[in-house]
Amino acid sequence: MKFSRQLVLGSLAVLVLSACSSSPTQRRQAKDDFDYLETTEFKPWVLPQGATPQFYPNYDIPQGAFHGGVGNVVDIRPPQQVLELIPGARAERQNGEVTLWMLRQDEAQKVWDTALKMIAERKIPLRKQTDSMVETDWVDWVSEDEDVTIGSRYLMSMVETNNRYGFKISLIGWRENGQVQTVSTTNKERYNAFMTNLVTTRYDSDVRAEAARRAQELVKQIPITMGSDRSGFPVIIARTPYDVLWQRLPELLPKMGFTIEERNQSQGTVKAKYAAPDDEFWQQVGVKPIELKSGTYTFLFGDLGNRTSINVTDSAGKPVNEALLKEMVPVLSAVVDKK
């Protein structure tokens, strides 16, 4: 199940969940029938006089007063997991509530700020708000897994205990088709996890956006020189980490006349077809055209820590000569600077 989109009607937030096909009842209930509910009670065995019974406790049914649904009331859907998208955070689930624990207060504060941002962007109405607590109004969930429209209210708060700092989400109100009801343990756990995941996915999105922004800033200032790899062979050296350079390759190589056909980050290879740019390109970058024939080439990128090595092979897998690599250095530098 995934979050697909959000609708806002007046002051009521409506969150839409999508699921796989089939009816809601089929997704929630076990297949076949529920004839076992009509099973008559067991009667104790009557042993022949003088017989000595042998008891094996392996399959004893535990005795006790157990509470919970039976038959078509039992929800067979797997528990909704809390997405672990916040580095260093540990999710604790207790009594249907979710607490994300962090080791530092600033980390918990960042999660709190993310939650407030998510609430504002999704226009979730609030009933109460303090510096460390918010109580939401009704949030409606339209889910393909449900026969009814689910409504829920939440209490989100910052907590602290034993030098740990947490962000806690508690489901405090439940209704179905507008009628307030007592929430089941299963639904409390499930819809607490849904709301928690709205926060964790937003946190992850913000972190990725910030990483991309930093990478873009770093790539603007990449010194490009000739050098040698660990084996002493001539290569182009980009003075930036491998991961940073890799993110920018889809933009940099096409500007040099290379159409990317295949990429494999784990192997550090990019297969691309080269067609010489027009005269206008060379005039803009202020570099003379390189003597590279049109065709398919493979770029080989090596992780050297805070630097990245770049080599190029032709369609036969043979490295291009050192002179050609030297010609490519000012071109690559000009494209990076232009970016």
Curated annotation (Swiss-Prot):
Membrane topology: Lipid-anchor
Gene3D superfamilies associated with the record: 3.30.530.50, Outer membrane protein assembly factor BamC (3.30.310.170)
Pfam families: Lipoprotein_18
Cellular localization per UniProt: Cell outer membrane
Principal subcellular localization: membrane
A Gene Ontology BP annotation from the UniProt entry: Gram-negative-bacterium-type cell outer membrane assembly
Keywords: Cell outer membrane, Lipoprotein, Membrane, Palmitate, Signal
Tagged with keyword Signal: yes
One GO CC annotation: cell outer membrane
Lipid attachment points (S-diacylglycerol cysteine): 20
Lipid attachment site numbers (N-palmitoyl cysteine): 20
Signal peptide: 1-19
Function as written in the Swiss-Prot or TrEMBL entry: Part of the outer membrane protein assembly complex, which is involved in assembly and insertion of beta-barrel proteins into the outer membrane.
HAMAP family found in the cross-reference section: OM_assembly_BamC
Similarity-based family: Belongs to the BamC family.
NCBIfam families registered for this protein in UniProt: PRK11679.1 (NF008674)
Assembly and binders: Part of the Bam complex.
Protein name (record): Outer membrane protein assembly factor BamC
Organism, scientific name: Vibrio cholerae serotype O1 (strain ATCC 39315 / El Tor Inaba N16961)
Lineage: Bacteria, Pseudomonadati, Pseudomonadota, Gammaproteobacteria, Vibrionales
